[in-house]
């Protein structure tokens, strides 16, 4: 008797996409960090955009605007903490993503590896200019 998931027309499509997915055996949880980087980047952009709506960079009122965000804006404290901890999570995922590439020998694909290193340096320079210097 054949399995219904392999004979039914609709279930056959779902089975071939999710259950019997043709994936290499070396695919492990280390391969999730690329998509986690995308999620962290989206969270950083969205929370940064919403925080920038209420922040003033004037030296006399900057601290007051941060307290305004935390106290008066709906879930402003959550936006601030998501943005701060999201940056740390972004760099953790970034370093683990590069570490996975080193472990599996992705540096042999020189063009892809060099583009990734340029992106890594661009992210580090952006973080330095935006978070460390001010």
Swiss-Prot record:
Keywords: Electron transport, Heme, Iron, Membrane, Metal-binding, Mitochondrion, Mitochondrion inner membrane, Respiratory chain, Transmembrane, Transmembrane helix, Transport, Ubiquinone. It is a multi-pass membrane protein. One of its GO terms (molecular function) is ubiquinol-cytochrome-c reductase activity. This is Cytochrome b. It comes from Chiroderma salvini (Salvin's big-eyed bat). The lineage of its organism: Eukaryota, Metazoa, Chordata, Craniata, Vertebrata. GO terms for biological process: mitochondrial electron transport, ubiquinol to cytochrome c. Binds 2 heme b groups non-covalently. Heme 1 (or BL or b562) is low-potential and absorbs at about 562 nm, and heme 2 (or BH or b566) is high-potential and absorbs at about 566 nm. Belongs to the cytochrome b family. The cytochrome bc1 complex contains 11 subunits: 3 respiratory subunits (MT-CYB, CYC1 and UQCRFS1), 2 core proteins (UQCRC1 and UQCRC2) and 6 low-molecular weight proteins (UQCRH/QCR6, UQCRB/QCR7, UQCRQ/QCR8, UQCR10/QCR9, UQCR11/QCR10 and a cleavage product of UQCRFS1). This cytochrome bc1 complex then forms a dimer. It comes from the Eukaryota. Heme b b566 binds at residue 97. Its main location: mitochondrion. The chain crosses the membrane at residues 33-53, 77-98, 113-133. Its cofactor is heme b. Component of the ubiquinol-cytochrome c reductase complex (complex III or cytochrome b-c1 complex) that is part of the mitochondrial respiratory chain. The b-c1 complex mediates electron transfer from ubiquinol to cytochrome c. Contributes to the generation of a proton gradient across the mitochondrial membrane that is then used for ATP synthesis. Gene3D superfamilies: Cytochrome Bc1 Complex, Chain C. Heme b b562 binds at residue 83. It is found in: Mitochondrion inner membrane. SUPFAM superfamilies: Transmembrane di-heme cytochromes. GO terms for cellular component: mitochondrial inner membrane.
